[in-house]
Amino acid sequence: MSKKRLYEIAKELGKESKEIVQRAKELGLDVKSHSSSVEAATADKIVASFASAKKAVAGTSEAKAKPSTEPIKTEATPSKPAKDKTEQATNKPSPSPASSPKPVEEASAKAPASKQEQAQGTAAPKVTRPQSRNFKAEREARAKEQAERRKQQGQQRPQGNRNDRNDRRNNQNDRNDRNSQNRNDRRNRQEQGNQHRNQGQSQYNQQRQSFNQGPKIDFKARAAALKAEQNAEYARSSEERFKQAKANKEALREQNKRKEQAKLEDLFVEVESPKPTAKAPATPAPTAQDPAVDTRRKKQARPDKERDNFDHEEDGPRKQQKNRSSQNQVRNQKNSNWNNNKKTKKGKNNRNNNATPKPVTERKFHELPTEFEYTDGMTVAEIAKRIKREPAEIVKKLFMMGVMATQNQSLDGDTIELLMVDYGIEAKKKVEVDAADIERFFVEEGYINEDALEERPPVVTIMGHVDHGKTTLLDTLRNSRVATGEAGGITQHIGAYQIVEGGKKITFLDTPGHAAFTSMRARGASVTDITILVVAADDGVMPQTIEAINHSKAANVPIIVAINKIDKPGANPERVIGELAEHGVMSTAWGGDSEFVEISAKFNQNIDELLETVLLVAEIQELKADPTVRAIGTVIEARLDKGKGAVATLLVQQGTLNVQDPIVVGNTFGRVRAMTNDLGRRVKVAGPSTPVSITGLNETPMAGDHFAVYEDEKAARAAGEERAKRALLKQRQATHRVSLENLFDTLKAGEVKSVNVIIKADVQGSVEALAASLQKIEVEGVKVTIVHSAVGAINESDVTLAEASNAVIIGFNVRPTPQARQQAESDSVEIRLHSIIYKVIEEVEDAMKGMLDPEYQEKIIGEALIRETFKVSKVGTIGGFMVISGKVTRDSKVRVIRDGVVIYDGQLASLKHFKDDVKEVTNGREGGLMIEGYNDIQVDDTIEAYIMEEIKK
């Protein structure tokens, strides 16, 4: 079924849409606006409701109104007057009631009254309009009527008559409503510029004049008169406004004068009275002479809208420029008066006008502190905040003390102390703690809690000469085969191990005995509690033995002497005891303080006695530690692992080290990612005297560095970065600069050749040992320059650096990566790989000796005597000679000796035997020779032949 919208129903019934919407709501329909749609049946109900209402109205008006079929006289019925802007509508004759079913109202509206009748005020009789109209029937009737009219006009219309065409155009729409009038007006305005149209319009006006009974109205003159009247009225109102504004201004001026006079009088009263009382200024009462000023802004009387349509004409208000300027002045003055005198409102600008004044709060008095802890560089504002005083007060005190300062100026310590003395406060300087200083944890007395101290395992370092059995002894103690795993059978880095004896733990550190590992032995002695000095019974005291004794004495560590290899036939323990006594190590049997134990590490002889001695000495020392504090300790060894990164072997000395602890190790920092003990097992906690290997550091630390655990990772990072920055600055400051004092040494050093070396090793201790050993090599005229040293495999960056610095890469217990090996082959960079340290030293020493310039000595190989000379043009002088001793060779150098004096020293140009070129002429034979660059050869000259031979070193 089809639907209809409410506005379509309204159009059919000739009703307004809102009436249809209202009627639909009365019928109980859910509609919202005239655009709502309803079913066809519902639409019929709405139409039927209006039809029933129409019948009810028609029944009531039948007795009062005449029947609609009776004709109505419309000659005396004038239409409504039209507006001035629109033209007069065409007066058309009314059709008869029989010929047209149109309503009476439409027929009467088609005969508009003339202007004369409107002026005379002729009233038209009232016509009763029906409540509803059948628009469809009306449209059909109009269509028929228009068709008949067109037919009649077409028969009577002459050819080429423009006036008839205009009449037909005007008569096409007989509805004299507002839309047709506006359309005709627009069309007429568009054709005003056409002269032919103007003539036709004049004819049309003349024809229209015949229909209108009365004189023609001049609309232009009427509009001009209306505009003149409006301008005059506007001028009169402007003059009145100007006079009113002037009067208001004078009244305001007088009022301000009276207010100023009242203020002056109050001021004089306050000066004369000793204790003035607060009074509100009296406002003078308005008198009869002072008229009340109406400061309210009046609404401007805007001229009629009709005069705006004639602003383009010459007689408009634009002509009155002088009056307009005066009007603007009056308007501005009035606006200013209105703004000055307007009533106060509750708003942002006047929110406190009527508010009661708050009582003045007294400042709280703060007592001065008894003590003040200060730092150098504190500002006046900071001091004022600390002692709860105003900065201006402190600035004043400083000014009285002779110190000119502002609140943002820094003060030194002496000035702050003087200021506190003036206030009666005891000043103390704050001791600033360097967060990057790890050493403070080892020396601070308050760091360790004396009540929480517990017994800890002793740390024992095994020291001695190379190949005296240190690692074999430790191997026996651990029941393992550590010695067989070392390259060359010697220990080349510190090993940290822990064993259990009698229910008690003992931590052992195995140090290298080779001369190159002096720094390692010193590092081991600094962290140990007891030193076991291993001496072979057949070798006795050796250089590294003496060095170990000195390290132990420097660290004030007790020494236990283990005389090893007593199972050998040539063992002599008594000789060893005597030799040690010469170096200050006395046995307890001889009145000393060192314990001596004769052992055989190979056959496990007297090992238990040695361990009992260690525990006894440790018990005497009363070794204790606090496991409750954050862990501190020392780096035993460090290396760079390909899969794990930086790996450091730490010895915990105080506290407890846990996994995930933020830690600072030397100049590096990080978080403990994982911990493993000496057996390779992962642990989460490491107590005092426990050696562990950790990962998680950002770089590889140096062996011997201290470490400390911080409260959080942020503090650890800040401390580590600060330590790295300080180390770099210290390294830069250590660079020597050329001065007048060392200029000669610098020039002399430039003549010395150098061997550039890049060292890569498996652990940090080996790097240090190699660097120290290579720098100790003494070869006259050659020195070793270590370009770079690090831990880890040889990589591409090492090869690139070696190529740029012309260096040799030495790898100790490491191997180059495949990419580094290929790059080294293409760049011709030499890589030497070793696993035994003394072989590295020998090889570098040979290379240094090979870099020296060879030394040569002169060797005379023969003499010849000139017997004849021949001068050949373009060749030179040829000397015929005879060898009197030795031989003369082609590549030998010669000297020309005349009367025992060397005349010339040079090289042979040619050597011949008769006409043949020969390489040498032996003793007793003759030949000819020429000397390069020399032709003054004479008879009886002696030719001495010699060569330069290299001297072997």
From Swiss-Prot:
Keyword Protein biosynthesis found: yes
Residue numbers spanned by region Disordered: 53-368
G2: annotated span: 489-493
Region of interest called G4, as start-end residue ranges on this chain: 564-567
Region of interest (G5), residue spans: 600-602
Keywords, sorted A to Z: Cytoplasm, GTP-binding, Initiation factor, Nucleotide-binding, Protein biosynthesis
Binding site for GTP: 464-471, 510-514, 564-567
G3: region residues: 510-513
Gene Ontology CC entries for this record: cytosol
Main location: cytoplasm
Pfam families: EF-G_D2, GTP_EFTU, IF-2, IF2_N
Comp. bias (Basic and acidic residues): 135-151, 162-190, 236-266, 301-318
Localization (cell): Cytoplasm
Domain tr-type G: 455-622
Residue numbers spanned by region G1: 464-471
GO molecular function: GTP binding; GTPase activity; translation initiation factor activity
Matches recorded under NCBIfam families: IF-2, small_GTP
UniProt record similarity statement: Belongs to the TRAFAC class translation factor GTPase superfamily. Classic translation factor GTPase family. IF-2 subfamily.
Protein name: Translation initiation factor IF-2
Organism: Streptococcus gordonii (strain Challis / ATCC 35105 / BCRC 15272 / CH1 / DL1 / V288)
High-level lineage: Bacteria, Bacillati, Bacillota, Bacilli, Lactobacillales
Gene that produces this protein: infB
